[in-house]
């Protein structure tokens, strides 16, 4: 007798999840190991909980989304994080992306304009024992200058251009990954590397993200 979706063996479910991520281009061993350790199901609540292991974005609170796992993996892979790196994430959301980054970097700072999301993510980080993440309610479009410079910056919301304040907070040799383009159209995921003089830009793939909005939310 075949088990139903609710009775799926956790090991088989994880194997299927990782296979889907690998089949979409996530090949870095450290990233795959991080995605194996961090259970996406812990970050998806309510009526969408049974879809946590599908490769698709899902709604969360405050009108935001948790990105599809393959995109989380590809963005993490593009950052080429070293174990001693200090990373800034713009857009905490559910906290899933920051949790993945925490397995790759020495220290992760993540900011979001929605206080509720920061509060819920912080509680979840504590529950999961992820002690190298600091989540803050802040206007992410201005970065986190008091902790700059950063080895890596990940922006999980779309900007019309790579934000100048974030570029300025990258170390020389640092990498930023950011979706660029209009929010009502397909955007391009851009990898920016800071050089001794100027920046190098590389287009990675088309994506769809919520917009990067200035200011602090009221929720």
Swiss-Prot record:
Catalytic activity: [protein]-L-isoaspartate + S-adenosyl-L-methionine = [protein]-L-isoaspartate alpha-methyl ester + S-adenosyl-L-homocysteine
Record-linked Pfam families: PCMT
GO biological process entries: methylation; protein modification process; protein repair
Localization per record: Cytoplasm
Signal peptide from the UniProt entry: none
GO molecular function: protein-L-isoaspartate (D-aspartate) O-methyltransferase activity
Cellular component annotations (GO), alphabetically ordered: cytoplasm
Predominant location: cytoplasm
Keyword Methyltransferase: yes
Active site: 67
Entry EC no(s): 2.1.1.77
Keyword Metal-binding attributed: no
Record-annotated membrane-spanning stretches: none
Entries under PROSITE patterns matching the protein: PCMT
PANTHER family: PROTEIN-L-ISOASPARTATE O-METHYLTRANSFERASE, PROTEIN-L-ISOASPARTATE(D-ASPARTATE) O-METHYLTRANSFERASE
Stated role: Catalyzes the methyl esterification of L-isoaspartyl residues in peptides and proteins that result from spontaneous decomposition of normal L-aspartyl and L-asparaginyl residues. It plays a role in the repair and/or degradation of damaged proteins.
Protein family per UniProt: Belongs to the methyltransferase superfamily. L-isoaspartyl/D-aspartyl protein methyltransferase family.
Protein name: Protein-L-isoaspartate O-methyltransferase
Protein source organism: Cereibacter sphaeroides (strain ATCC 17025 / ATH 2.4.3) (Rhodobacter sphaeroides)
């Amino acid at each position: 007798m075949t088990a139903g979706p609710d009775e799926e063996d956790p090991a088989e479910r994880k194997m299927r999840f990782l296979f889907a991520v690998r089949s979409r281009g996530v090949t870095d061993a450290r990233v795959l190991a991080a995605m194996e350790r961090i259970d996406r199901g812990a970050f998806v609540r309510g009526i969408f909980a049974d879809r946590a292991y599908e490769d698709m974005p899902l709604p969360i609170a405050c009108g935001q989304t948790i990105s599809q796992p393959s995109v989380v993996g590809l963005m993490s892979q593009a950052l080429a994080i070293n174990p001693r790196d200090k990373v800034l994430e713009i857009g905490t959301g559910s906290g899933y992306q920051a949790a993945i980054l925490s397995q790759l970097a020495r220290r992760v700072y993540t900011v979001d304009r929605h206080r509720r999301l920061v509060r819920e993510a912080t509680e979840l980080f504590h529950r999961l024992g992820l002690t190298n993440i600091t989540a803050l309610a802040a206007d992410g479009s201005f970065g986190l200058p008091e902790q700059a410079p950063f080895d890596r910056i990940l922006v999980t919301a779309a900007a019309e251009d790579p934000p100048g304040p974030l570029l300025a907070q990258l170390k020389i040799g640092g990498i930023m990954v950011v979706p660029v383009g209009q929010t009502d159209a397909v955007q391009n995921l851009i990898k920016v590397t800071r050089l001794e003089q100027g920046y190098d830009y590389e287009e990675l793939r088309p994506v769809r993200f919520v917009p990067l909005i200035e200011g602090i939310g009221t929720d």
